[in-house]
A protein has these predicted regions:
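C-terminal structural segment of proteins
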Residues: 1-196
Length: 196
């Protein structure tokens, strides 16, 4: 993530406050259901990271506030995590679409789930409908395909220089399938691009 010069100077807070709808670290923290702490002089407050993004490049951040911390619960036994992105270049490129998925598996079923997606809305966002779909299911090909379809229907991307809205929806579906492939070795097929 990032070139060597950027990794030497950049901060996690800067990445989040940049408010990019496709920031890689933001996707990671959203999938981990992180909380953000803000400080202004002696005044402190915290809120879920998912509530920090109000609109395109708009944050719940007052003019003199600084990000003091970002935290999330330490994943326990049975926790799995994966991050995926599609970009034109393999390294050092801004994503067209990116996504992260955090799961907790118990007794062969998905006990908790949290997914995030970027490039598919004006803000980086969680995918609560997809997470709800996953809870209680076995991690198999049918579940992977259902999660991918749910994610695709849950987003409202716009067409821009990085791709059409339909293409971004397609990419998100493919990346959700990739999560299952990486975490469980599941080959769930691919989606075909929709044509009008």
């Amino acid at each position: 993530m990032g070139s060597l010069p950027i990794r030497q100077r950049a901060t996690i807070a800067g990445n989040i406050v940049n408010a990019s709808p496709i920031g890689d670290m933001t996707m990671v923290f959203l999938a981990l259901d992180a909380e953000i702490g803000l400080v202004e002089g002696d005044s402190q407050r915290s809120l879920p990271l998912r509530d920090f993004f109000l609109g395109y490049k708009q944050l719940d951040l007052r003019p003199q506030e600084l990000v003091e911390w970002v935290r999330f619960e330490k994943p326990g036994e049975g926790a799995l995590f994966n991050f995926e992105k599609v970009s034109k270049r393999t390294h050092l490129d801004i994503a067209s679409v990116n996504t992260a998925m955090a799961l907790n598996i118990s007794n062969g079923r998905i006990h908790t789930a949290c997914l995030s997606a970027g490039g598919v809305a004006p803000i980086p966002r969680q995918l609560p409908q997809t997470a709800e779909y996953l809870i209680g299911r076995r991690p198999d090909a049918e579940t992977a395909r259902g999660a991918a379809e749910t994610a695709r229907s849950e987003v409202t991307p716009i067409s821009d220089v990085r791709g059409s809205a339909d293409y971004k929806r397609l990419l998100l579906g493919q990346l959700v399938l990739a999560h299952f492939n990486v975490l469980f070795g599941i080959e769930a097929g691919i989606f075909e691009e929709e044509t009008a």
